[in-house]
Curated annotation (Swiss-Prot):
Species per Swiss-Prot/TrEMBL record: Solanum pennellii (Tomato)
Residues involved in a divalent metal cation binding: D57, H254, N290
Stated family: Belongs to the alpha-IPM synthase/homocitrate synthase family. LeuA type 1 subfamily.
Pfam families (alphabetical): HCS_D2, HMGL-like, LeuA_dimer
Pathway note: Amino-acid biosynthesis; L-leucine biosynthesis; L-leucine from 3-methyl-2-oxobutanoate: step 1/4
Protein name: 2-isopropylmalate synthase A
Amino acid sequence: MFFFLQLLVPIISVFQSKKHYYSTFIRCSISNRRPEYVPSKISDPKYVRIFDTTLRDGEQSPGATMTTKEKLDVARQLAKLGVDIIEAGFPASSEADFESVKLIAEEIGNNTDENGFVPVICGLSRCNKSDIDKAWEAVKYAKKPRVHTFIATSEIHMKYKLKMSREQVVEKARSMVAYARSLGCEDVEFSPEDAGRSDREFLYDILGEVIKAGATTLNIPDTVGYTVPSEFGQLITDIKANTPGIENVIISTHCQNDLGLSTANTLAGACAGARQLEVTINGIGERAGNASLEEVVMALKCRGEQVLGGLYTGINTQHIVPSSKMVEEYSGLQVQPHKAIVGANAFAHESGIHQDGMLKHKDTYEIISPDDVGLSRSNEAGIVLGKLSGRHALKSKMLELGYDIDGKELEDLFWRFKSVAEKKKKITDDDLIALMSDEVLQPNVYWKLGDVQIMCGSLGLSTATVKLINTDGQEHIACSVGTGPVDAAYKAVDLIVKVPITLLEYSMNAVTEGIDAIASTRVSICSIDRHTIMNGSTGQTIHRTFSGTGADMDVVISSVRAYIGALNKMLSYEKLVSRYSKPEDSVVV
């Protein structure tokens, strides 16, 4: 980290004075200022737009496939978080993705909050008419629609992937931006893919041409995470100084994390003049991921006034942790404990010296309050639930935790809660969140777990008998043997559902401490015979993967619930795809 700060010093030095740099620590402040949205300009030069691409770039992570319902839930949460632009997907990649983007544009893109805020809804497209038509058709229903189009500009991409000359690439970019504007889209973003490795003079030329064609935002991607902060900051500075018409558009950054520099590069870009930052929740994305929303936003919030030129965002940071947990749950990508801001250990202090300092004054070792990001310090405050608690108390507690549930969802959760409360003396917030995830935040249910019976030991193979219930209420029972109780149970499930499934990942952790802790299981599956897609950048064939989670005090039941959850997500995806295309159709992403 010290190395990163050294790299940032030349860039941020213009903003800081010795007085600020060595000033006493000041608690992070919350800013609610948000300038009126105009596509190509921002009235306050210190305001930075946050462009979230969790639903597009983030979902390209292996195992991160989300259902339409899950995407809508995430989009709603992003709107609560206050992100300026939601990149809802890549409409041309499949009809299923097109429908998801369209639904988000229709619902989230028209839901104005009490402050008059409604996010921009953006769809990605390659530089061709059919992609742009699809993107516009999907997002045009939003109050603030945007089309984001891209083409590669580095020599290696133009020569080997596009097989196009510089002149052809410039003309394609110019004409397609103009075409997007001709459809009636007044907000067009252009990205020169692999800008970090592109020739500077060529970059200035193509950016100048798309500005003349009507682009309102120019996104500068470090597509392979190759640059370092001083280098990326200089790139933004050079683009500002040498691109004709640059004063009439917004400069954006999109930094990948291949060298672990995405957050540092993003901040360097902001200090150099970028006023839109492209990020994802938890930093998820292809390969090593993207710049993390929570890291970028909290860095600006905590250090913006002192060393980052007063830059600020419109993010409601108290929704960061709920957003992180939702994306973690739906994507199946577990946040590592030491992850900055949202990791389980982010606010934990084990060292005796640190604990002593914290007890005397929290600011000794804590630069961010857990409350700033929506994390309660303790489960002890507020309503305490037990086996005698009723539905009203449960509903109130879940509302306190950020979950507004009613009707069947509340009823289903209540009976799971009562079942656990009979066996467990103390129900913690983490227990409730795990049960909520397992009982309510699940995809459409095609198969539901009825019963599981296990026989195992050291004398022979484990045996599992599993009862599943389908959507018609019919019970199906199968028995199988395996190398362990979980393996036997999974094989019994396979005998019932008759779908070829490959288990890719399996993990389990205790939600809380103690012998009576709830076990939370995560699995990732794929079907080798189907769901084959092609990566548009690499041309590689990829098997779409599906994740599931389960929670129970019994580790085998928790494991089976997770497996069935992943299976239901896969079947939901199959049903959605079958509405629009033949099962054998491949998808380009």
